[in-house]
Amino acid sequence: MTTNNQGVDTRELALMILLEIERGEKSHIVLRQVLEKYQYLSKQDRAFLTRLAEGTTERRIELDYIINQFSKVKTEKMKPVIRNILRCAVYQIKYMDQ
């Protein structure tokens, strides 16, 4: 469920969404725009992308707490791309089976 047959990585799309949200964009608007732009994604990929982006956003505080328990660099000091990659990874490990 990472790269589909059109060469689009759903995890990269989720990361892009999370970075836009951090820049102040509304989560539902960014997600809708991405889903419209990549409407050829399979139903399974769209569901995965939605769950990963929404779940990571909803549990951001908890995910940062977990990351901070194991990282020498606190999440607020990390580069946004690194912080959001780690958030996605922890969310997938803790809440998803993929």
For each feature predicted by the language model, list its residue ranges.
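Class I Rossmann-like S-adenosyl-L-methionine
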Residues: 1-98
